[in-house]
From Swiss-Prot:
Organism: Encephalitozoon cuniculi (strain GB-M1)
Binding locations of S-adenosyl-L-methionine: R34, R63, D80, V128
Positions annotated to bind Zn(2+): C255, C257, C274, C277
UniProt domain Trm1 methyltransferase: residue ranges: 9-382
Descriptive protein name: tRNA (guanine(26)-N(2))-dimethyltransferase
InterPro entries (alphabetical): SAM-dependent_MTases_sf, Trm1, tRNA_met_Trm1_C
Family matches, as PROSITE patterns: SAM_MT_TRM1
Reactions catalysed: guanosine(26) in tRNA + 2 S-adenosyl-L-methionine = N(2)-dimethylguanosine(26) in tRNA + 2 S-adenosyl-L-homocysteine + 2 H(+)
Any one Gene Ontology BP term: tRNA N2-guanine methylation
Family, per entry: Belongs to the class I-like SAM-binding methyltransferase superfamily. Trm1 family.
């Protein structure tokens, strides 16, 4: 919300106010990003007396000041490389009535010796800052313009045991469909058109897990979200069990018919011929093959909400019911490949669940499902539904309704109309 205070224009978000000028970068589409970050950090550290939070690219200070005002046990370090941004941060800290503040400039060693203030403003390259303070922060929030890949190593050095690494990547187009750039930036080979909005999540978590193993660390995904034009990922960094990286990352054979075949570590023989259509499949990956969310954290956040933020509530409910299988199936795309009319999502879910398979919605794509059913079974259901052959349905035991588990999912209010904000990225403001 924007307003004028005399000659000064301001922007308010929740309880935080910042000044607005021609070089202020504020994207209202990222409010959800900030909202969920507050809730995740609050839930993960609710039993801690104090936590150190790094807002690595603070810009106006909005995100960091919200951490300060909404998480009572936080000590926040608001960093930016730009002097004009640092001046703005200091001004906005005072504007929000935070007097317990300290300014370090580029005195990174002074940070270790201090720590008495709740708000700490720093002027530094964030990679230099994180490298200079090993195992120092409980939370590191990295929200760049573009890729997050170049900051991961430094963040892993600076995060404490069981700290939370919060990553944003706004280059979702690269992660979804630019095969060459994705391989260069994220060291993962992708296939355009396959589970497009979940591929970025499993690509980034895989990259972080592989980088973490170099520092004798492992990762535990807390939440992984593919929202609008960006992805937002929360990872718990555990300073042990680096060997889990081998078990938790897989290559995947992908086919244009949407068949998938996971290749686990140590698998000696690989048949690249598709079992569904007999075409040659394409080798992609590595991808994170484990769960993308910690359901206990999600339930904890849901339990503490008052229901006012319907978009946040709906997306958390989506995450809570998602099954951990790799990727999802877009119903219109599958029906197009089969040359049949699109069927309702609910019919496919009921049929597969009645056949004994796991099914769920996915927050990544509204008209898609997650399931552990093989593509052959999915196609069989789609074809039977399109043909309307009741005798054949009964013969194969396919029922398109009546599954209690799916009924329970259908009864949940997900606020589907709010899943997408309809807003896109903004250009960076001119330099000051």
């Amino acid at each position: 919300m924007e307003s004028k205070d005399g000659a000064r224009e301001t922007i308010s978000e929740e309880s935080t106010v910042i000044t607005k000028n021609e070089w202020t970068f504020f994207n209202p589409a990222q409010k959800f990003n900030r909202d969920i970050s507050i809730e995740v950090v609050k839930e993960c550290f609710k039993d801690r007396a104090s936590i150190r939070v790094l807002d690595a690219m603070s810009a106006t200070g909005l995100r960091g000041i919200r951490y300060l005002k909404e998480i009572g046990n936080s000590i926040v370090y608001l960093n930016d490389i730009s002097q004009s941004s640092v001046d703005t941060i200091r001004s906005n800290v005072l504007l929000n009535g935070i007097e317990d503040a300290e300014y370090f400039g580029s005195d990174l060693q002074g940070i270790k010796e201090s720590g008495n203030a709740r708000a700490n403003v720093v002027k530094s390259d964030c990679n230099v800052l994180m490298t200079s303070l090993p195992c120092f922060f409980d939370v590191i929030d990295i929200d760049p313009f573009g890729s997050c890949s170049e900051y991961i190593d430094s963040a892993l050095r600076a995060i404490r045991h069981k700290g939370i690494l919060c990553l944003t990547a706004t280059d979702k187009g690269v992660l979804c469909s630019n095969e060459r750039k994705c391989l260069i930036k994220y060291s993962t080979s992708i296939m355009k058109g396959m589970g497009m909005n979940e591929v970025p999540l499993r690509t980034i978590v895989s990259l972080v897990s592989r980088q973490a193993s170099k520092f004798d660390c492992s990762v535990e995904p807390v939440m992984s979200l593919s929202i609008d034009f960006y992805v937002r990922i929360f990872l718990r960094i555990v300073r042990r069990n680096p060997r889990s990286v081998v078990e938790r990352n897989s290559h995947v054979l992908m086919c244009v018919c949407h068949n998938l075949a996971e290749i686990r570590s140590g698998q000696r023989e690989i048949d690249s011929r598709c079992s569904n259509c007999s075409r040659r499949m394409r080798l992609c990956g590595p991808f994170w093959n484990g769960p993308l969310h910690d359901v206990k954290v999600i339930q904890g956040v849901l339990g503490g909400m008052n229901g006012g933020n319907k978009r946040l509530l709906g997306i958390l409910r989506y995450l809570e019911q998602e099954i951990p299988t790799m990727f999802y199936y877009e119903i219109p795309r599958l029906c197009s490949l089969l040359g049949i009319s699109t069927i309702k999502q609910s019919r496919l879910m009921h049929a597969l669940a009645n056949m004994g398979y796991q099914v769920s919605y996915t927050h990544s794509e509204l008209n898609a499902i997650k399931t552990n059913a093989p593509i052959a079974s999915i196609n069989k259901v789609l074809i039977l539904s399109g043909a309307g052959d009741q005798e054949r349905m009964e013969e194969l035991g396919v029922e398109f309704n009546g599954n209690e588990g799916v009924k329970a999912l259908e009864s949940i209010e997900f606020f589907k109309g709010l899943l997408k904000s309809g807003m896109g990225p903004l250009p960076l403001p001119r330099k000051h």
